[in-house]
From Swiss-Prot:
Protein family membership: Belongs to the 6-phosphogluconate dehydrogenase family.
Alphabetical keyword list: Gluconate utilization, NADP, Oxidoreductase, Pentose shunt
SUPFAM superfamilies in alphabetical order: 6-phosphogluconate dehydrogenase C-terminal domain-like (SSF48179), NAD(P)-binding Rossmann-fold domains (SSF51735)
Active site annotation, chain numbering: K182, E189
Stored InterPro entries: 6-PGluconate_DH-like_C_sf (IPR008927), 6PGD_dom2 (IPR013328), 6PGDH_C (IPR006114), 6PGDH_Gnd/GntZ (IPR006113), 6PGDH_NADP-bd (IPR006115), 6PGdom_BS (IPR006184), NAD(P)-bd_dom_sf (IPR036291), Pgluconate_DH (IPR006183)
Binding-site positions, substrate: N102, S128, G129, G130, H185, N186, Y190, K259, R286, R445, H451
Lineage: superkingdom: Bacteria
Biological pathway: Carbohydrate degradation; pentose phosphate pathway; D-ribulose 5-phosphate from D-glucose 6-phosphate (oxidative stage): step 3/3
The organism of origin for this protein: Buchnera aphidicola subsp. Baizongia pistaciae (strain Bp)
Record protein name field: 6-phosphogluconate dehydrogenase, decarboxylating
Organism lineage: Bacteria, Pseudomonadati, Pseudomonadota, Gammaproteobacteria, Enterobacterales
GO biological processes: D-gluconate metabolic process; organic acid catabolic process; pentose-phosphate shunt
Subunit text: Homodimer.
PROSITE patterns for this protein: 6PGD
Family annotation (Pfam families): 6PGD (PF00393), NAD_binding_2 (PF03446)
């Protein structure tokens, strides 16, 4: 019996669509799912395709060409550990496991270390693009041993999305680097979504625009600098109606939820001493929004501004919102890529940030016109420390910061919560400041804890007896 070229474990929507993507690209695919009825249903719904179902792990593994390539599209954590343990008795030296879940990068490092003891390679690969991306072409971020990647790269390039004819996949680096990049990708996604939500809220509350009008504004924005997947879907979300002819957006509970990757990103930023302020505020906002019962109580007890906003030039104000959103987006990406650079140095990953920005240009959730500018800046100079310091982005920042400042000021004056936008201008002002009040903080630390300080006029470390 002929053996299959690749195997996929996990037939939820991502695994199923990835298997169909592989099959469409002329690969024979073995599939396995813990719930057997799901496997049977997939075969029933996809007749005459090179999908081969198996109902035991042993039969599944033995159905594959050696060295085997097995893709895991399952829930991260215990489920991944259990699945790998079930595979081990039937694997051979040189086999490759690709973990395509949203796995914590340190778990990937540990699993890769343990598997390498028995000669099995682990590739931790981030897959972005959602269920549609999995089917028609995701952005793929594989990390692990270079030789393992070289073996599986032909199939990854076949199934990946492409930008200007080049597949949106590249070798990220060793061990957990692929999952780390996917984690930061998701953090940037949090920031993007929060900035868009705040812009929508300003248009809705301050300008009192209806959903149709806001959708048209987002459609116009999507034709220019802000062109992106998230802006594109937002314009459609705003005008979607339910079966009662109500705008669906107005019927959705305002409690943000998450799966934890944003939290991982912010925790890593703290470990690296990276000021990931905008993305962190976006994570915190989801936590705050989930306090619905408390917010309802507070809305009856705590007072806010009573003034009624009157705009003199609506089109001019909308343009300022657009500029504020774009600069906020730039700052979010600047923080995310700065964190990638810090992680690369700490873990010796040698991340190629220009290549990473390139593979984000198609297939993934954060794909945006902006990424072409990022790639271009890295191709011109790969040694800069922050996107805001590069020619294109500093020109935008120096032009748009006044709009961001005005939108934040007006929103605060009228009681509109905008944590991401306000974080953006705060970061911008802090980053461009040659002097910050941290001198006082250092003096306070030395006063109560003898933590010492440095001076600007003398070299060395100093401590003062503040009580004398």
């Amino acid at each position: 019996m002929a053996k299959q070229q690749i195997g996929v474990i996990g037939m939820a929507v991502m695994g199923r669509n990835l298997a169909l993507n592989m099959e469409r690209n002329q690969y024979t695919v073995s599939i396995f799912n813990r719930s057997l009825d799901i496997t049977e249903k997939i075969i029933l719904n996809n007749p005459n395709k090179n999908l081969f179902p198996f109902f035991s792990i042993k039969d599944f593994v033995l159905s594959l060409i050696v060295p085997r390539c097995i893709v895991l599209m399952i829930k991260s954590g215990v489920a991944t550990d259990d699945t790998i343990k079930s595979l081990i008795p039937y694997l051979s030296k040189g086999d490759i496991i690709i973990d395509g879940g949203n796995t914590f990068y340190k778990d990937t490092i540990q699993r890769g270390y343990e598997l390498l003891k028995i000669g099995v390679n682990l590739i931790g690969a981030g897959f972005s693009g959602g269920e549609k991306g999995a089917l028609y072409g995701p952005s793929i971020m594989p990390g692990g041993r270079q030789e393992a990647y070289n073996y599986v790269s032909p199939i990854l390039k076949k199934i990946a999305s492409n930008s200007e004819g080049i597949p949106c996949v590249t070798y990220i680096g060793p061990d957990g680097s692929g999952h780390y990049v996917k984690m930061v990708h998701n953090g940037i996604e949090y920031g993007d979504m929060q900035l868009i939500a705040e812009s929508y809220f300003i248009l809705k509350t301050l300008l009192r625009l209806d959903n149709q009008s806001i959708s048209k504004i987002f459609d116009i924005w999507n034709q220019g600098e802000l062109n992106s997947y998230l802006i594109d879907i937002t314009k459609d979300i705003l005008i979607k109606k339910d079966d009662q002819n109500n705008y669906l957006i107005d019927c959705i509970l305002d409690e943000g939820s998450s799966k934890g990757t944003g939290t991982w990103t912010t925790k890593s930023a703290l470990d690296l001493n990276e000021p990931l302020t905008l993305i962190t505020e976006s994570v915190f906002f989801r936590y705050l929004s989930s306090l619905k019962s408390q917010r309802l109580l507070a809305s009856k007890i705590l007072c806010g501004p009573k003034d009624f906003f009157i705009v003199l030039n609506r089109d001019d104000f909308i343009e300022k919102i657009r500029q504020a959103l774009y600069l906020g987006k730039i700052i979010s990406y600047a923080q995310g890529f700065s964190q990638l650079n810090s992680a690369s140095q700490k873990y010796n990953w040698n991340l190629k940030l220009g290549e990473i920005s390139r593979i984000f240009q198609s297939g993934c959730i954060i794909r945006a016109k902006l990424l072409k500018n990022i790639t271009q800046e890295y191709s011109s100079n790969n040694n800069f420390v922050n996107l805001l310091l590069t020619p294109y982005f500093r020109e935008i920042a120096n032009t748009y910061h006044s709009s961001l400042r005005e939108i934040v000021s007006i929103s605060v004056k009228y009681g509109i919560p905008i944590p991401a936008l306000s974080s953006a201008i705060s970061y911008f002002d802090s980053y461009r400041s040659a002097f910050l009040p941290s001198n006082l903080i250092q003096a306070q630390r030395d006063f109560f804890g003898a933590h010492t300080y440095k001076r600007i006029d003398k070299s060395g470390i100093f401590h003062t007896n503040w009580y004398s």
